[in-house]
Structure formats: structure tokens, C-alpha cells
Amino acid sequence: MAFLNEPPADAALDALDRAVVEAVRARLAAGPRTRLDASALSLRALLAGAQPGDTKVLKALWGRIEAAAGPSLITSGGLAQVLAADRYGLGGRPLPAEEALKAVEEGARALIDLSSDRPWWGRLLARPELKIAGALPDDARARPQAFLVTREGSGPTGEDRTFWVTDSGWSETKIVEAMGEAGLVADPLAAAGGLKLFALAGYVQAEDGRLTNAPGRLTGVIGAAPIF
């Protein structure tokens, strides 16, 4: 049988494989970047001009390097576990949402389902030290299904979406219209427990004047995430 024969050597591919291994080792030894927005800008530069297939591979490699070099990763919910495995590998530790948030307070990062029955994201209004700094999937055409929560947050990267919560009893359509009149593009993401979550186009700071008369008595920005 042909499979009993030793496969031919390919010195060129072997050299490329060794170069990849050496580059990954060197990158891990260098440690994580000091800021999440710096990491996002670097990844975006690497993805510039990449083909769709290349983009998936580069994001997966980048995510695994970040997971290995950065804080421990917690996952909460089935979708979060799937998305975390795709981006960061299988090292995420599963916990309920509230326990995941407590782990973030102690220095971890947590990827938490948006589809949770309880609006854990609303609790971030009362816990400003915790911030959404990423959302997966993170391409502009996809709706976020899970949020990466950290203590550090993310600054503007030039292509972002911001997450805003309100307790307004208005319909989502009416809220979107009101936000549009204020100069903000809002997209409803979730509603539970009397709270509504919206994605705002761009990087919107908590003190942005356009939010001054936003609908609702209890409102606030709970983070922002880059788009690739």
C-alpha cells in the first residue's frame, strides 16, 4: 500500500513551520500589550487586505496568543463557550454570569452570553469598574452574541460600537428614533428585567452630550468594543 511508504520531505514547508513556532514563542515571551485598544489596532493592521479565510486564521491565532499571555478567561453560557473556543481555544473556565463578574473583579476576563435569561449586563450600571471591552462575533455584519467583560475597558480604535442601557418603558422603535434625533445610531440588542440594551454606532463616551436627554431614568454606557 502507498501509505506504507515514507512521505517525501518538504524542506521549504518545514522551514516555514519552524519559523511560525519560533515567532509564536517570541511573541508569548514578550507578554501582553498594555492596553486592549492597542491590541485591537494592531490586529486590525494585520487584517488589512486579508482574504476571508486568512482573517479567520489570523483572529484565531491572535486570540490564542492573547489568552496565553493575558489574564485568565472565564466563560458563561453555551454561546460564549463556543465563541471563546473558536477565538481563544479551550482554556476558558465556565461559571454562571454573577460568578464570572466576581472573577473579573479579581482580575480575570469573562466572555458572557447575551442570551442569558437574566440581564447581567444591566448590573454593570452599578459596577462601573467592570466594562464591556469586546463583543463576539466582532465583524461589522454580525450581531454580538457574547460580551468580553474586563476591568480595563477599551479606548476608541476608529471602528467601534458602544453599549448603552436604559430602563425606558418606550418601545425600542421609539427609543431608536429619539436617539437618532440626538445624532446617535442605535440598534436594539436585548431586553429583560425592565432594561433594554442597545448598540450605538461608534465610540460614545459616558459623558457625551448627546446622551443628556436620552430616554429613561436609569441609563448609561457600559462599554465599547472594536469591530474588525
Q: What are these regions, as identified by a protein language model?
A:
Residues 1-228:
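Domain-level signature for soluble enzymes in the chorismate/prephenate branch of the shikimate pathway
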